[in-house]
């Protein structure tokens, strides 16, 4: 037991909670609401965390370690209270203490909002990485934005997604600290004036700009049982000059709050819709805002301990998580040139030893490009620096590939009226990594082939991982206790030890226990579904789950088309043997992404028809879980039998949901894509259901443009029937044209859109066959339990602890920090 056993002396803890309720709300404990109790418990826990947080900062000051600044547009942290208690090794003590006074920790945890600081896998990965860094004892700061409303809260109305603000801060958030003493000015617009300083030196002066103040809010990231507390600093924007009373008194109410609105808009939402020019501008401003503030704070911290800025690469590394923070390259150059007075050569030398880039996508549209006009107008000085980086890089290309203008067209940072952010990151970064072995290989051979040929030494792979402390210890306490009972608790900090479970896979008693735990988790999720969806689902049915961002390449459409096919089969052959299935979906679609939103409507329309058809005797149920997020995800992973990881091969960089399901003993139905490939290597062909084309086959079809979905439509009557149901009103009786765009995306070869871009029809039969195998396999409970246990046992490679250790060894070169607590 760590020192928290002493701190969480039950009586002392209850007294502190009671006192906190009294001081904060002027109430007795018995009068307090659950939200008030959550706030009080959180403040008491935060007090414990703050002792370790201060000790960690002291250790940083004393040991002066190299620090990684992990820059990410998203941090999908999930709830903090339960996670902090687990990492303080005090979860059970607190649960028992609260029970003694009639309070339920589960109910209290449910009062905490999910901090709306991210959306998908990118943000959750950043959160897992921060937790692993703290647990492994490495100094790290997460750098992001404190969004007031996140992306959005998803509501389903008449089957359609409706976006409403996610007001996660409405009750205040106990696990954050406002740090106005570390605020920085961020400048937009204006122009750059030059001054000749003599000796051939020119000074660049930025004038006529608008500015906002960036104010950091620090959140503690608690390591597991080691007193280490790292910091997530998320930036809020405030006006440099606040409310203008003079304007207000003159009746000009808009002008009175103009500066406040300018600042407020910057941090209102994650990924503002960029289908229009204002949205594009806002996104670029957001990115520059948090990157500039984070760099200023990092350099100020460095200068507190060091006089020579040339030593910066020995003490700081800036990891750019995807293309959003890559303006950091030019902003760091600006600070070194204009504020530190360095020469171009020295500034470039420092920058190229400080910045590293993680590529997260094979999708070309996600490699950000900004119109030069916008970039130059919003960031005039930064743009000048990008121009010079580009000019020098183009000279390098010409030197290495004389007369090859095609190389310049493909590799230049500035080309065709655009600033290509991934190119900027690759040119300046000393490391460029993909996030699964297959993804990295595709980057080297396809998307970034020219860069790989010119600078192969920069490229490396770091297969993603997840933190077992949240996604097993917290999400699935029944299974976590069972694992510990069989192999000890070493897996909590060294997931490779979970492999010791493998011998139990053939043990009938262990199989029975495993299935019983899965059943209890399914009962828990069934209760959640009944409460939130009003649908009765059978915990004895196969829980077949696909939860992730909604995108065409992730192929939620393939899944629901197959459900439609199964329904047709049951209607045509009512006496066929069929193992009952519950198909569970959860996904947010970007507000401006029409086909993704239409897919959500289709899933809900299919659910409406199937769930209300008494004649099929509950053989199929379809559930769409509203507002999918980390907190409900934890329950879903624990309850799944089948994990759908069905992206078009070559399109998913890695995936991490696949790993969370595997850890919790679900069997994967997937393509050979992303990290599925490495999971397959770990767990073997007997414990996973693989289908569909390989990435090589997909890439070949794309190059040759020889795929014709119409041929499949014409020759496969089952597929033809399912697709016809999209447009004959079967699932949309009031508007038979409702799903026409989905139908056209799969078949309309007359449009400019290359039809069925993601090969849904090409993979359909293979997918249906794999689903049939699953149904057969599930009948043999012993075989299923064996495979499930082996999935958990072989998930050791996929801990974010392993991933982070590889980043440390190969890219960051950080020393361990030892935190001493009296």
Q: What do these predicted regions represent?
A:
Residues 1-822:
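A conserved ligand/cofactor-binding region detector
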């Amino acid at each position: 037991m760590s020192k928290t056993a002493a701190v969480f002396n039950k009586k002392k803890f209850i007294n502190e909670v009671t006192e906190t309720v009294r001081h904060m709300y002027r109430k007795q404990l018995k009068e307090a609401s659950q939200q008030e109790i959550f706030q009080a418990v959180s403040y008491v826990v935060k007090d414990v965390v703050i002792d370790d947080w201060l000790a960690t900062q002291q250790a940083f000051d004393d040991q002066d370690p190299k620090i990684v600044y992990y820059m990410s547009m998203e941090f999908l942290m999930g709830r903090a209270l339960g996670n902090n208690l687990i990492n303080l090794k005090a979860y059970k003590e607190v649960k028992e203490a609260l029970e003694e006074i009639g309070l339920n920790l589960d109910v209290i945890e449910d009062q905490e909002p999910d901090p709306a600081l991210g959306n998908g896998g990118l943000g959750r990965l950043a959160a897992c990485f921060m937790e692993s860094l703290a647990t492994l004892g490495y100094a790290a700061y997460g750098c992001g934005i404190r969004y007031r409303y996140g992306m959005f809260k998803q509501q389903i109305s008449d089957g359609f997604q409706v976006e409403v603000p996610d007001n996660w801060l409405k009750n205040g958030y106990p696990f954050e600290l406002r740090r106005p003493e570390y605020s920085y000015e961020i400048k937009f617009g204006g122009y750059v004036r030059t001054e000749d300083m003599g000796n051939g030196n020119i000074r660049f002066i930025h004038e006529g700009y608008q500015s906002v103040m960036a104010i950091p809010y620090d959140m503690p990231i608690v390591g597991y049982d080691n007193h280490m507390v790292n910091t997530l600093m998320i930036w809020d924007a405030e006006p440099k000059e606040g409310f203008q009373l003079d304007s207000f008194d003159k009746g000009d109410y808009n002008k009175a709050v103009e500066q406040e609105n300018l600042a407020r808009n910057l941090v209102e939402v994650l990924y503002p819709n960029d289908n229009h020019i204002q949205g594009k501008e806002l996104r670029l401003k957001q990115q520059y805002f948090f990157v500039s503030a984070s760099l200023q704070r990092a350099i100020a911290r460095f200068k507190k301990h060091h006089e020579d800025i040339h030593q910066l690469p020995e003490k700081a590394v800036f990891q750019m998580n995807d293309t959003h923070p890559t303006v950091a390259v030019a902003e760091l150059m600006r600070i070194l040139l204009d504020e530190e007075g360095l020469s171009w050569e020295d500034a470039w030398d420092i920058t190229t030893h400080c910045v590293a880039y993680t590529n997260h996508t094979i999708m070309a549209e996600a490699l950000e490009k900004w119109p030069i006009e916008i970039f130059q107008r919003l960031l005039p000085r930064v743009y000048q620096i990008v121009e010079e980086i580009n000019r020098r890089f183009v000279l390098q290309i010409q030197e290495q590939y004389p007369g090859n203008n095609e190389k310049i067209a493909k590799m230049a940072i500035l080309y065709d009226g655009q600033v290509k952010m991934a190119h900027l990151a690759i040119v300046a970064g000393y490391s460029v990594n993909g996030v699964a072995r297959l993804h990295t290989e595709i980057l080297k051979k396809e998307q970034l082939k020219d860069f790989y040929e010119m600078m192969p030494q920069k490229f490396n792979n770091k297969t993603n991982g997840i933190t077992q402390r949240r996604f097993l210890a917290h999400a699935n306490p029944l299974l976590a206790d069972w694992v510990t009972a069989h192999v000890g608790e070493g897996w909590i900090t060294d997931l490779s030890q979970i492999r010791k479970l493998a011998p139990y896979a053939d043990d009938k008693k262990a199989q029975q226990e495993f299935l019983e735990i899965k059943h209890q988790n399914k009962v828990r999720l069934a209760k959640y579904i009944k409460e939130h969806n009003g649908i009765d689902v059978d915990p004895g049915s196969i829980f077949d789950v696909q939860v992730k961002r909604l995108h065409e390449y992730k192929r939620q459409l393939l899944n629901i088309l197959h459900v439609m096919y199964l329904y047709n089969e049951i209607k045509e052959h009512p006496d066929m043997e069929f193992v009952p299935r519950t198909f569970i979906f959860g996904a947010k679609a970007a507000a401006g992404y029409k086909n993704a939103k239409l897919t959500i409507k289709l899933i809900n329309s299919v659910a409406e028809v199937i769930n209300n058809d008494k004649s099929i005797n509950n053989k199929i149920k379809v559930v769409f879980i509203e507002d999918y997020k980390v907190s409900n995800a934890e329950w879903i992973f624990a309850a799944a039998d089948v994990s759908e990881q069905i992206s078009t091969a070559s399109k998913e960089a890695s995936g991490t949901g696949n790993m969370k399901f595997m850890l919790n003993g679900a069997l994967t139905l997937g393509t050979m894509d992303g990290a599925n490939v490495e999971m397959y290597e770990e767990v073997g062909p007997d414990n996973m259901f693989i289908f569909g084309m390989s990435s090589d086959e997909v890439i070949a079809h794309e190059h040759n443009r020889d795929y014709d979905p119409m041929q499949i439509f014409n020759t496969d009557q089952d597929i033809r029937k399912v697709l016809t149901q999209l447009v004959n009103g079967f699932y949309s009786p009031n508007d038979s044209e409702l799903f026409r765009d989905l139908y056209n995306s799969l078949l309309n070869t007359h449009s400019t859109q290359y039809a069925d871009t993601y090969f849904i029809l090409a993979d359909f039969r293979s997918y249906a066959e794999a689903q049939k195998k699953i149904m057969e396999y599930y009948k043999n409970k012993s075989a299923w339990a064996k495979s499930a246990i082996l999935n958990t046992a072989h998930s050791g490679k996929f801990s974010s602890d392993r991933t982070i250790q590889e980043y440390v060894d190969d890219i960051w070169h950080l020393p361990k920090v030892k935190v001493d607590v009296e």
